[in-house]
């Protein structure tokens, strides 16, 4: 677009002298769920890590009346502001190839498998039902956010480790970031009145005393915490805490909501709720999925809630058909046995006796039906 090219051609006028020889590039960057953004990279000297400044929000301001040169100035300001962090990260670049130094910085990221096929093509990925997990190295984590690089297949090969090793170390690093299961009511109260919601993960709740049974699973930083859902022992803890099976609502990449299966919630209604919230409340790149999950308390097995209901219906129908088939099989076998015995005993000309035996056969059939509840 003309706006992006104008920014590229004029941004040097707003930058310090050290950027005069910078080879400025525009690039399309694919983010979560197929969202594509336009970014600009402006190197400073021989710096190896170059921050990307995304232009899409500025373009929206431009089409709503903001002066184009003011937008260019904003891009320059953002690039200068990012320089300090880029220099800090640049110092750690040699360590990126040292797996022992990086493994504690790993983090699991989770997304909808169907929504992100192209984006995941070059990355280390593990599949978990409806979800795909990919992995990142968090070079810096603070209250303002996370600076990270994705774990690509080529980086894994440089490390000389397996996918399984990366997954195990990333899950351990995620646990070390803190696992939190909190009551949604307490979260709302803390936002209004202050205070910190209680972590319920190791508690055993009396659900009859919980007025609105809805809980949030995330990490201490509330950043990329939904991936904790993939850890079996955490799902087991949640089941023990609630004392029941539970539904998992994929609210965003940062957290998931947990609802006990208490007979109140219906899967079609939950799916509709998630889809509506995604469309109206959650930014596209932060949406996790629109597929509600069900988790069994005893086994900690998680599966698509809608497909689970369909599977149970199918199993129930098959079981019912099998029961019916078994009863009718017994009837046919009894009839065949009676016919075989009487054929040996009864002369063909004794029609009255045969009629009596037929009545006896009918009575036996009726008795079998009665005993089977049919």
Feature names for model-found ranges:
Residues 226-240:
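Short amphipathic alpha-helix segments
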Residues 22-216:
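Charged, alpha-helical interface segments at or near domain boundaries
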Residues 251-287:
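C-terminal structured domain segments
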Residues 275-311:
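TerminUS-proximal long segments
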Residues 244-248:
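A short linear hydrophobic-aromatic micro-motif
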Residues 1-30:
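N-terminal alpha-helical "arm" segments
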Residues 316, 320-374:
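Non-Sec secretion/translocation targeting segments of pathogen effectors
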């Amino acid at each position: 677009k003309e706006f992006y090219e104008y920014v590229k051609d004029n941004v040097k006028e707003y930058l310090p002298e050290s950027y005069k020889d910078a080879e400025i590039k525009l690039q399309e960057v694919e983010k979560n769920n197929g969202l594509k953004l336009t970014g600009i990279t402006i190197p400073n000297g021989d710096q190896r890590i170059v921050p990307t400044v995304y232009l899409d929000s500025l373009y929206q301001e431009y089409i709503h009346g903001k002066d184009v040169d003011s937008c260019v100035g904003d891009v320059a300001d953002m690039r200068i502001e990012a320089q300090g962090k880029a220099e800090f990260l640049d110092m750690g670049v040699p360590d990126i190839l040292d797996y022992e130094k990086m493994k504690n910085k790993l983090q699991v990221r989770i997304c909808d498998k169907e929504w992100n096929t192209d984006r995941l093509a070059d990355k280390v990925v593990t599949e978990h039902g409806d979800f795909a997990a990919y992995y990142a190295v968090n070079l810096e984590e603070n209250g303002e956010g996370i600076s990270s690089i994705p774990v690509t297949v080529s980086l894994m090969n440089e490390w000389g480790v397996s996918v399984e090793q990366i997954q195990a170390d990333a899950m351990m690093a995620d646990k070390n970031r803190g696992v939190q299961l909190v009551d949604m009511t307490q979260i709302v109260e803390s936002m209004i009145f202050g205070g910190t919601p209680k972590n319920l993960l190791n508690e055993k709740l009396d659900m009859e005393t919980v007025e609105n049974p809805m809980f949030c699973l995330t990490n201490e930083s509330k950043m990329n915490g939904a991936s904790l859902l993939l850890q079996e022992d955490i799902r087991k803890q949640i089941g023990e805490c609630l004392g029941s099976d539970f539904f998992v609502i994929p609210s965003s990449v940062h957290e998931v909501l947990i609802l006990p299966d208490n007979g109140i919630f219906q899967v079609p209604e939950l799916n509709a709720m998630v889809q509506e919230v995604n469309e109206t409340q959650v930014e596209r790149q932060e949406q996790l999925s629109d597929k509600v999950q069900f988790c069994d308390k005893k086994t900690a097995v998680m599966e698509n809630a809608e497909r689970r209901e369909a599977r149970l219906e199918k199993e129930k129908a098959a079981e019912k058909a099998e029961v019916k088939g078994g009863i009718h099989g017994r009837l046919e076998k009894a009839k065949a046995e009676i016919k075989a015995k009487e054929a040996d005993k009864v002369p063909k000309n004794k029609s009255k006796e045969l009629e009596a035996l037929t009545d006896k056969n009918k009575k036996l059939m009726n008795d079998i039906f009665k005993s089977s509840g049919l």
